[in-house]
Amino acid sequence: MKQTTINHSVELVGIGLHKGVPVKLVLEPLGENQGIVFYRSDLGVNLPLKPENIVDTKMATVLGKDNARISTIEHLLSAVHAYGIDNLKISVDNEEIPIMDGSALTYCMLLDEAGIKELDAPKKVMEIKQAVEIRESDKFVKIEPDSQLSLNFTIDFNHPVIAKQAHHFVFSKTAYKEQVAKARTFGFLQEVNYLRSIGLAKGGSLNNCIVLDENSILNKEGLRCEKEFVCHKILDAMGDLMVLGMPVMGKYTSFSGSHKLNSMLVKAILADAKNYEVLIAADPAKEFALQKAFA
């Protein structure tokens, strides 16, 4: 398989979730071995996608370097991961990626519009060689060897609508677009009110978030699918795993995982070379599996 980028530049304008201000997003092609590079066009600062540049994971995954930050990168990166894009410039003129409808669906449509272009360099894939696990109280994230990417996620909320949900997702681009991309972020009305009181979630609304009160969903249209809550967590995890800089072959398992735990997992994987192998020229069986996944 070859490395990829996009065929041509595409752009959109949306609202940032926390600041609530318009943000212009531009995706541009990059050459081979350039990786994923974010760019603050208002500041003239490049922010390469690297684990050491992740500076905050409380409310979202935040990239930072010097005086520049870009927040809520995970939904766009999830789509980039699913489309198998290796090299891409992502420019924004403010400190957030636009939230759009709270899912990755808009970004999938944007990438479809841009098209995928092969480059004259072999694709790099990270194969997990031994289990790596991060725990925090009863919460955990874990990745272990597998011949494909699969994500097993369980959430458990003390809420009558969500309760306990689990989903086993075997990655393919097609399955991602059908099961995961449309799943929206969600939050609780009490938390939203608090966040707004401290100057956050100014761009949040029923148009870009599933909002729940104590007993029900406030969005009149309801859910897009039965497991939308846990599928959004899978969406987030795929975005956070993209911080590794390349597609991953491994079995990811999580119970009540978070951006924080995912970021810790990424750094733990890279901390020991025995945990992984970067496949430059995959053997025929593995290459066929990858081609099938990203078709």
From Swiss-Prot:
EC assignment: 3.5.1.108
Superkingdom classification of source: Bacteria
Pfam families: LpxC (PF03331)
Amino acids binding Zn(2+): H75, H232, D236
HAMAP family (alphabetical): LpxC (MF_00388)
Protein name: UDP-3-O-acyl-N-acetylglucosamine deacetylase
Enzymatic class: hydrolase
UniProt keyword terms in alphabetical order: Hydrolase, Lipid A biosynthesis, Lipid biosynthesis, Lipid metabolism, Metal-binding, Zinc
Pathway per the UniProt entry: Glycolipid biosynthesis; lipid IV(A) biosynthesis; lipid IV(A) from (3R)-3-hydroxytetradecanoyl-[acyl-carrier-protein] and UDP-N-acetyl-alpha-D-glucosamine: step 2/6
GO biological process: lipid A biosynthetic process
Cofactor(s) needed by this chain: Zn(2+)
Catalysis: reaction(s): a UDP-3-O-[(3R)-3-hydroxyacyl]-N-acetyl-alpha-D-glucosamine + H2O = a UDP-3-O-[(3R)-3-hydroxyacyl]-alpha-D-glucosamine + acetate
Purpose of the protein: Catalyzes the hydrolysis of UDP-3-O-myristoyl-N-acetylglucosamine to form UDP-3-O-myristoylglucosamine and acetate, the committed step in lipid A biosynthesis.
GO MF annotation, one: UDP-3-O-acyl-N-acetylglucosamine deacetylase activity
Active site (catalytic residues): H259
Family stated for the protein in its record: Belongs to the LpxC family.
Record-level GO cellular component terms: membrane
NCBIfam families tied to this protein: lpxC (TIGR00325)
